[in-house]
């Protein structure tokens, strides 16, 4: 391809909309163009990158025994209502675009395909003899993100590879899950990415075991915690650790203290000379449940710990035996709208009585009470007294009628000891999620009543797995992990072109003739090569070559008459002057070993 025919439009200035380096470089390099909020056009070079990534994915999925298919993007609402996810995905802050057809039937634009594929499996896979089956597709997905940002990292339209496997039993599911784990590791390695597999929460997809693949990068939205012995890694949403120990309070009688204006942990500790880890703080939240209930939640937590919102939502879901659409802090304005005026924020204790909710106009009138283990393990502690400007000192759970059941609701933090090895410590890194694999179990097959006949002649729901890769996100993650001050440094396996031939001076016949010769030779050898034949200054061409990040640059310059060229490797900027035939040989050795 000649650059003069490529529709290459590069930008010198950083677009104001682009917050992170990879987004800036993809816009500046002419790879993508913004069409609307969270909506991007993939321009010719970007499309080549995406095709190269997709080719690697297809090869590894096929190697793993998966079958490629293509599923509809329009989903009848009935399927999602049967699985119980329609309201969660369309109401409030739900992420599914939905519409009505001219007959008034509700449809959703697919953000994921569990319902559709499970329904099809139930119709087509009737016997255990047909199992296991693993189906995958590469397709555009749609999600109505509340805050689209970072270019392709969090868009409203994106390309994804999603796969779904069906099994007769859990052991077979686990075997395929292990095969897919290895396939994913090979995919990311072949794409030239350092991707860390981490334990993860299953989120709205649901299921039992789940693992994310994170590309480590400073701009990553996810915080991952990795043990310094290399044996454990988890997304902070899922991570567990041993919290730092705190000094126990010396035994003493319960005391009621006046604490005017001391509504924060910091304020209390300063005024009373207390340690944060010796307090039990109480958080009030409101959970919106799938059946429409608005459930007040009271959470007790040790004063030096932070609440993990994902663990909280999972705990509420387990206790209520249904999905949670939203869970947010209760504010004084919320209380006023409910007609409740009796809750003293800043002075709440773990034993706040349910009667304070008696006048609530639309909330459930009793608290769902949860407590983190760090709080329940304290023998004595300081806490609120449920009265304005008052706290209790040297309180025990016995004073409050007994300790609630403790569970892990806290955020694990860097520097804390590891559960698997107390001698190891957690370290913190930022990551970009590029892949996620799940053991779904029977969640969807049971909800949709999709069964096969087992070897005993009885109907049984499928065991299912789900495996996703964000294809367009992976491309941008590669840029985030591989760039320098000059621009992108594409890994060779996914670069839009393997070599760029730059003619420094198009007015020099020796340079243009040699450039055409080298270009033709590389094409004949099967190299995907770009020829910069523009009538631009050499400096402009060199800057553009650095910006778009082609792995190898072959410069035809002032030594063209002698047949000498410059061979430059983009990853390390190493330059060698070589006879053009030798330079071509070096390229073939590197690219076609």
Curated annotation (Swiss-Prot):
Xref: InterPro entries: aa-tRNA-synt_IIb (IPR002314), aa-tRNA-synth_II (IPR006195), aa-tRNA-synth_II/BPL/LPL (IPR045864), Anticodon-bd (IPR004154), Anticodon-bd_dom_sf (IPR036621), Pro-tRNA-ligase_IIa (IPR002316), Pro-tRNA-synth_IIa_bac-type (IPR004500), Pro-tRNA-Synthase_IIa_type1 (IPR023717)
MF (Gene Ontology): aminoacyl-tRNA deacylase activity; ATP binding; proline-tRNA ligase activity
Leader sequence residues: none
Catalysed reactions, semicolon-separated: tRNA(Pro) + L-proline + ATP = L-prolyl-tRNA(Pro) + AMP + diphosphate
Cellular location(s): Cytoplasm
TM region positions: none
Listed PROSITE patterns: AA_TRNA_LIGASE_II (PS50862)
CDD domains per record: ProRS-INS, ProRS_anticodon_short, ProRS_core_prok
GO terms (BP aspect): prolyl-tRNA aminoacylation
Assigned keywords, A-Z: Aminoacyl-tRNA synthetase, ATP-binding, Cytoplasm, Ligase, Nucleotide-binding, Protein biosynthesis
UniProt-listed Enzyme Commission number(s): 6.1.1.15
EC class name: ligase
Pfam family, one: tRNA_edit
GO cellular component, one term: cytosol
Major location (coarse): cytoplasm
Subunit structure as annotated in this protein's UniProt entry: Homodimer.
Function: Catalyzes the attachment of proline to tRNA(Pro) in a two-step reaction: proline is first activated by ATP to form Pro-AMP and then transferred to the acceptor end of tRNA(Pro). As ProRS can inadvertently accommodate and process non-cognate amino acids such as alanine and cysteine, to avoid such errors it has two additional distinct editing activities against alanine. One activity is designated as 'pretransfer' editing and involves the tRNA(Pro)-independent hydrolysis of activated Ala-AMP.
Comment field on protein domains: Consists of three domains: the N-terminal catalytic domain, the editing domain and the C-terminal anticodon-binding domain.
NCBIfam families in UniProt: PRK09194.1, proS_fam_II
Record family assignment: Belongs to the class-II aminoacyl-tRNA synthetase family. ProS type 1 subfamily.
Protein name stated in the entry: Proline--tRNA ligase
The species this protein was found in: Parasynechococcus marenigrum (strain WH8102)
Gene name tied to this protein: proS
């Amino acid at each position: 391809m000649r650059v003069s025919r490529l529709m290459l439009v590069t930008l010198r200035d950083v677009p104001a909309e682009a917050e992170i380096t990879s987004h800036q470089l993809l816009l500046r390099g002419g790879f993508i163009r913004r069409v609307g909020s969270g909506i991007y056009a993939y321009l010719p070079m970007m499309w080549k990158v995406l095709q190269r990534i997709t080719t690697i994915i297809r090869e590894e999925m096929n190697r793993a025994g998966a079958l490629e298919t293509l599923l509809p993007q329009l989903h009848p609402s009935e399927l999602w209502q049967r699985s119980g996810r329609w309201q969660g995905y369309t109401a409030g802050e739900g992420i599914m675009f939905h519409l009505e057809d001219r007959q008034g039937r509700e449809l959703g634009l697919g953000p994921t395909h569990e319902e559709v594929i499970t329904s099809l499996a139930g119709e087509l896979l009737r016997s255990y003899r047909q199992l296991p089956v693993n189906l995958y597709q590469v397709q555009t997905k749609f999600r109505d993100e509340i805050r689209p940002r970072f270019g392709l990292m969090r868009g409203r339209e994106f390309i994804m590879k999603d796969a779904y496997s069906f099994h007769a039993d859990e052991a077979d599911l686990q075997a395929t899950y292990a095969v897919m784990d290895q396939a994913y590791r090979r995919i990311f390695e072949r794409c030239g990415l350092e991707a860390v597999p981490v334990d993860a929460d299953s989120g709205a997809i649901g299921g039992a075991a789940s693992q994310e693949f994170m590309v480590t990068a400073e701009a990553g939205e996810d915080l991952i915690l990795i043990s310094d012995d290399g044996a454990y890694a988890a997304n902070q949403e899922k991570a567990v650790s041993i919290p730092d120990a705190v000094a126990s309070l010396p035994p003493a009688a319960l005391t009621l203290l006046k604490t005017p204006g001391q509504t924060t942990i910091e304020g209390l500790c300063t005024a009373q000379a207390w340690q944060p880890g010796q307090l039990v703080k109480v958080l009030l939240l409101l959970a919106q449940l799938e059946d429409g209930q608005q459930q007040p939640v009271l959470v007790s937590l040790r004063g030096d710990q932070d609440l993990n919102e994902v663990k909280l939502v999972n705990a509420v879901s387990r206790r209520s035996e249904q999905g949670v659409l939203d869970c947010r802090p209760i504010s004084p304005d919320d209380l006023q709208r409910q007609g409740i005026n009796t809750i003293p924020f800043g002075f709440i204790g773990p034993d706040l009585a349910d009667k304070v909710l008696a006048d609530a106009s639309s909330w459930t009138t009793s608290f769902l009470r949860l407590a983190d283990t760090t709080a329940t393990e304290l023998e004595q502690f300081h806490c609120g007294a449920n009265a304005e400007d008052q706290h209790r000192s040297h309180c025990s759970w016995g004073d409050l009628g007994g300790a609630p059941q403790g569970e892990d609701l806290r955020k694990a933090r860097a520097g804390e000891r590891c559960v698997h090895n107390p001698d190891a410590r957690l370290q913190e890194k930022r990551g970009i999620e590029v892949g996620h694999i799940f053991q779904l179990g029977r969640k969807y097959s049971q909800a949709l009543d999709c069964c096969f006949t087992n070897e005993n002649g009885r109907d049984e729901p499928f065991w299912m797995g789900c495996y996703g890769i964000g294809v367009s996100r992976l491309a941008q993650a590669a840029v985030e992990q591989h760039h320098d001050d000059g621009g992108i440094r594409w890994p060779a396996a996914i670069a839009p072109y393997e070599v760029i031939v730059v003619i420094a001076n198009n007015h020099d016949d020796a340079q243009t003739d040699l450039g055409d010769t080298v270009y033709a030779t590389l094409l004949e050898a099967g190299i995907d090569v770009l020829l910069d034949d523009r009538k631009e200054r050499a400096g402009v061409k060199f800057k553009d070559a650095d910006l778009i990040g082609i792995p190898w640059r072959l410069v035809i310059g002032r030594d063209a008459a002698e047949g000498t060229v410059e061979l430059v490797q983009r990853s390390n900027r190493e330059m060698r002057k070589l006879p053009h035939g030798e330079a071509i040989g070096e390229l073939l050795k590197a690219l076609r070993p």
